[in-house]
A protein has these predicted regions:
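Sec-dependent N-terminal signal peptides
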Residues: 4-15
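Exported/periplasmic ABC-transporter solute-binding proteins
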Residues: 20-44, 50-53, 57, 61-65, ...
Length: 246
């Protein structure tokens, strides 16, 4: 009888531990930094984070369709605001970081006059994320439109479903250049040599990245802890190290 009770207790304990895992929908641009944030958060609270990455638009659609996420870290503010307006979140989103758009390549081709470079025969393929579902893709479209070359470069564009796919196109040489997030540079340290330039933030809408807790969560207390952590000075220090404005 004692043995049965012990086994039952262990099962309950294991279930409790498993129940601590927070499922966090994470914008693809955060795939590198979320590992560092999750490690730091676990050290502070003992709570395990299970990140599920994708484009912000696709993640928002999954949430509307009932995906079992607890928290959503978006690459913009509009997708979490939309979820709030439709009643999927516990409250309006907070901004946890500001993103920076870069043009980047594995080739040292010079970005002094990057718009002229994109029009030249030196560049055959340009990677951007789908502007409809990926905020950094939308920012790239805005910047290219502002420079007056969006229409002209259409035959060269290779579109990724998320910034992660764009980064793969860049690192594997599928694209000569691409538009990505500054956090890619930190992610690539010690792995891939990259040449890059920050795009003037005046030529695209500021990339405000928002966080929300989802009403569907069954772990409200832990979700609140993670929410507060992401807005804390410790998390901001990590995000800043990855090139985000805080």
């Amino acid at each position: 009888m004692k043995r049965v009770f012990l086994v039952f207790s262990l099962l309950l304990f294991s279930a409790a531990l498993f129940g601590q895992n927070l499922r966090v929908a994470v914008a693809a641009n955060l795939q590198g930094v979320i590992k560092v944030l999750a490690k730091d958060f676990k050290e502070k609270t003992g709570i395990e984070i299970e990140p599920i990455a994708g484009s912000s638009g696709n993640l928002a659609t999954q949430i509307k369709n009932g995906a079992p996420f607890d928290v959503f870290l978006s690459a913009d503010i509009s997708f979490p605001e939309g979820l709030f307006n439709e009643g999927f979140t516990t409250k309006a989103p907070d901004v946890y970081a500001y993103g920076s758009l870069i043009i980047v390549s594995t080739q040292d081709i010079g970005f002094e006059n990057w718009e002229r470079l994109l029009l030249s025969p030196r560049v055959n393929k340009i990677a951007i994320a789908n502007p409809k579902i990926a905020p950094y893709g939308k920012a790239a479209e805005e910047a290219l439109t502002k420079k007056g070359i969006w229409t002209d470069i259409q035959p060269k564009i290779v579109q990724g479903e998320s910034i992660a796919q764009v980064n793969t196109y860049i690192s594997t040489g599928v694209a000569d250049v691409g538009f990505s997030t500054q956090s890619l540079i930190k992610d690539a340290e010690g792995k891939t040599k990259l040449y890059w330039k920050i795009i003037d933030p005046q030529i695209y809408t500021p990339i405000k990245q928002g966080i929300v807790i989802l009403k569907a969560t069954k772990q409200t207390a832990n979700a609140e802890k993670f929410y507060r952590y992401i807005l804390s000075a410790d998390a901001k220090k990590i995000l800043k190290a990855y090139g985000y404005g805080v």
